[in-house]
């Protein structure tokens, strides 16, 4: 039995979001021994339990109050939400924040030889999908009548097997579509991973732990999106150099021994530093330019 006084977090056991979810928790300082076959893991240094389940079970576990938090793809969350509403339920939960992984989109795809000129071409078509409610919402908005063929896997083989005229499936790179003689024709939903919380009263100690976790997640994401920049620059060009490196705060400026015309500059830049930016810095007289990753960050 799970101890209800501990924070319960559901995450995908295996699949697209599993490794990224594990890495996020680890970088937040949560020490968990995640053995391959164990469905429940206990944090060693915080009152947190991890439930490792199928991704399509996570929204229901949160909405039904079985767990406190869930890490889930927005596509799976939205499909479950629409499914429950279709059954007359009023599911409740909170989205605490989007995360910086799990990027994908749900798309309509058709065979390469399908004469597709617009979504109107799918009028009365048979479409295979694992996301019938998201598909229905999109095509209802377009006033397109269609027949749904529900498949829980290998959706991309449906046209070749004669089960459907087209498909609606998740796309990350498009390689799977291409391998099955399909092409993407419409994007109907864009998705990332998100962190959700159950509705209802939360004990104060749990809520404090959630706030601490959110602060750490923010720090992890900021660190991933930021770089620590060190360089030498002409004193007369400081503002021009700073303009090329947008950051959270003003840079640290240090004098260079034996050089009155140049300074050392240290700063955190909130944007990816491209080669073109470094070339512009060089053109302004900057030198010894170092771009370093940041492991942790808290403003």
From Swiss-Prot:
UniProt keyword list: Amino-acid biosynthesis, ATP-binding, Cytoplasm, Glycosyltransferase, Histidine biosynthesis, Magnesium, Metal-binding, Nucleotide-binding, Transferase
Pfam families: HisG, HisG_C
Catalytic reaction equation(s): 1-(5-phospho-beta-D-ribosyl)-ATP + diphosphate = 5-phospho-alpha-D-ribose 1-diphosphate + ATP
Cofactors that this protein relies on: Mg(2+)
Coiled coil stretches, renumbered: none
Function description: Catalyzes the condensation of ATP and 5-phosphoribose 1-diphosphate to form N'-(5'-phosphoribosyl)-ATP (PR-ATP). Has a crucial role in the pathway because the rate of histidine biosynthesis seems to be controlled primarily by regulation of HisG enzymatic activity.
Identification of the protein by name: ATP phosphoribosyltransferase
Source organism (scientific name): Photorhabdus laumondii subsp. laumondii (strain DSM 15139 / CIP 105565 / TT01) (Photorhabdus luminescens subsp. laumondii)
Lineage: Bacteria, Pseudomonadati, Pseudomonadota, Gammaproteobacteria, Enterobacterales
Annotated gene: hisG
